[in-house]
Amino acid sequence: MKLNVSFPATGCQKLFEVVDEHKLRIFYEKRMGAEVEADLLGDEWKGYVLRVAGGNDKQGFPMKQGVLTNSRVRLLMSKGHSCYRPRRDGERKRKSVRGCIVDANLSVLALVIVRKGEQEIPGLTDGNVPRRLGPKRASKIRKLFNLSKEDDVRRYVVKALLPAKEGKENAKPRYKAPKIQRLVTPVVLQRRRHRLALKKKRLAKRKSAEADYAKLLAQRKKESKVRRQEEIKRRRSASMRDSKSSNQSAPQK
């Protein structure tokens, strides 16, 4: 079995091939996330504590956290599940994954050093691999360099040195810097003020339209009420005329 060991403190990662099955027994029946003392792997591992991060079996199927078995299962997966990347929106697919319990059928086991031991391991703990990219967000750059709100963040951007082109080795070195996100500049403040002004303008326009509509509605109701009263008055007068004419035309006894 191969052990893919990483050390987050230095950023290094190294692959070890262990032939002796007796040394690997310390990992058997352990779940993903379990911490194991690695003293039995050899003298150079004395004092080291490793965390089981995952692995693949001999057919290449990955271990999945939460599947409490040491065999292979087929699960219906959707967006957000580990070991699966949807190709279309809302797509679900049944995929074969391995359980989160370690056994002898794994080909590669991923481990993370939680506690460093007494000795250095060549290629893993003695070197240091710097991060290729620095932070991109303005607040994270401030946090990294302990800056205040008044400091200019643009001066502290971590730039990457670009390799020189062929035939231009003596030219001025070129750097590549990320575009800072969430950076507050005068243009950003101007856009914010413009958006607020548009919002206030829309609000005033809506209130004016509502007032005009309420005024028109009240006027229409008043006109309708006047027309209804006039109609009632006209009908009443017409009925009174009809009753008078009928009384006059009736024969006297």
Curated annotation (Swiss-Prot):
Annotated disulfide bonds: none
Domain of life: Eukaryota
Post-translational modification remark: Ribosomal protein S6 is the major substrate of protein kinases in eukaryote ribosomes.
UniProt keyword annotations, A-Z: Phosphoprotein, Ribonucleoprotein, Ribosomal protein
Compositional bias segments (type: Basic and acidic residues): 226-244
GO molecular function list: structural constituent of ribosome
Listed InterPro entries: Ribosomal_eS6, Ribosomal_eS6-like, Ribosomal_eS6_CS
Region described as Disordered: spans on this chain: 209-253
GO cellular component: ribonucleoprotein complex; ribosome
GO BP field: translation
Function, as annotated: Component of the 40S small ribosomal subunit. Plays an important role in controlling cell growth and proliferation through the selective translation of particular classes of mRNA.
Family, similarity comment: Belongs to the eukaryotic ribosomal protein eS6 family.
Xref: PANTHER family: 40S RIBOSOMAL PROTEIN S6
Protein name: Small ribosomal subunit protein eS6
Source organism of the structure: Manduca sexta
Gene it is expressed from: RpS6
